[in-house]
């Protein structure tokens, strides 16, 4: 064989490895569920109000600062900046640092919360930024509406750690919360799991692992704008790129790459095969999962991650519900009560969890 033949075989081998091992067969679409309540769409007539414009301005400024620090490889500054997203918010809840079996965390407890009723919350931030502090608006709200104690974990972040370390910390915290409340060992009466964005990814990965390990399952789960497919093959990754003011600056370079290169970038960055259900819960077995609510914006890049996950879960027989809002930024729920749509989203979360509250 001549040099060109060997080169051709090498290229073919690399293509096959990426296409069938790294990326896998993928999930393009699943049929819309026949359940009339899934999906639910929320929209408001007319132009966005002044509160929406103000939040957009805040998000653009915050995102610009964070992306600038990341380009400068100043992770400390990027993380400190991201942690200010809940700054200025008045909280009813109190916050107490704790150690969840070796995982740093904080308890978030609203007045009158029952500590035998608990929520494990996993923050977002692209696996790189974020902490319990950045997401106090969300965790405090969860405690208020459910009357539960919320355990917000400070899992290990990339790039200092591997993606599998993020996953392992979530599993460790889950074991711990089953037996421990804010005041020490205490029997658990009710458990929910929640997460947003990258934390939504970890949340959905966690409930599949809980099922496989036959552990006590949560009564329900809530995933806000979850990343479900790190092959980044959803159509909205590109189609909504210009509308997503929060994610576009961080995913601009990734979005410009061919799929072949993108798969190798994910393997290098995450140190995990992109099609591995551990990192791409969409590509795993979605049967026999607990009731799950997924919320997403129709203007965000991860819309199809949410949509495809819910449709596949429904097709697999799991009680999963999708709710979408028009013209919202990624994780708009964190801007409660500034945004009327955030208030609406929390009303829906409250109704969903109330429907799955333990007796």
Model regions and ranges:
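A glycine/proline-hinged amphipathic helix-loop "lid/cap" segment
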Residues: 2-108, 359
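Alpha/beta-hydrolase superfamily serine-hydrolase fold, recognizing
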Residues: 5-25, 94-359
């Amino acid at each position: 064989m001549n040099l060109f033949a060997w080169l051709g075989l090498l290229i073919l081998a690399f293509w096959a490895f990426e296409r069938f091992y790294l990326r896998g067969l993928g999930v393009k679409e699943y049929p819309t569920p026949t359940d009339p309540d899934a999906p639910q769409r929320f929209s408001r007539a007319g132009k966005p109000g002044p509160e929406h414009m103000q939040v957009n301005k805040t998000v653009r400024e915050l995102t610009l600062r964070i992306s600038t620090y990341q380009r400068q490889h100043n992770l400390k500054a990027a993380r400190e900046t991201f942690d200010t997203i809940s700054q200025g918010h008045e909280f009813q809840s109190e916050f107490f640092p704790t150690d969840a079996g070796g995982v740093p965390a904080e308890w978030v407890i609203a007045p009158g919360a029952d500590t035998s009723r608990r929520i494990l919350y996993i923050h977002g931030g692209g696996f790189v930024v974020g902490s319990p502090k950045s997401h106090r608006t969300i965790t405090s709200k969860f405690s208020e509406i459910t009357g539960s104690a919320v355990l917000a974990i400070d899992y290990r972040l990339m790039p200092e750690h591997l993606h599998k370390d993020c996953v392992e910390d979530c599993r460790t915290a889950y074991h711990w919360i089953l037996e421990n409340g804010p005041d020490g060992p205490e029997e658990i009466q009710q458990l929910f799991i929640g997460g947003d964005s990258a934390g939504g990814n970890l949340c959905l990965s966690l409930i599949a692992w809980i099922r496989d390990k036959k552990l006590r399952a949560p009564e329900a789960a809530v995933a806000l704008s979850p990343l479900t497919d790190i092959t980044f093959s959803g159509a909205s990754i590109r189609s909504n790129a210009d509308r997503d003011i929060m994610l576009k600056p961080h995913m601009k370079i990734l979005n410009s790459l061919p799929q072949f290169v993108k798969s190798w970038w994910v393997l290098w960055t995450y140190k995990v095969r992109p099609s591995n259900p551990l990192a791409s819960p969409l590509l795993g077995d979605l049967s026999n999962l607990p009731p799950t609510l997924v919320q997403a914006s129709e203007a965000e890049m991860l819309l199809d991650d949410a949509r495809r996950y819910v449709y596949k879960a429904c097709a697999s027989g799991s009680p999963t519900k999708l709710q979408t809002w028009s013209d919202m930024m990624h994780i708009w729920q964190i801007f409660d009560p500034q945004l009327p749509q955030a208030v609406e989203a929390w009303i829906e979360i409250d109704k969903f969890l109330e429907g799955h509250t333990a007796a």
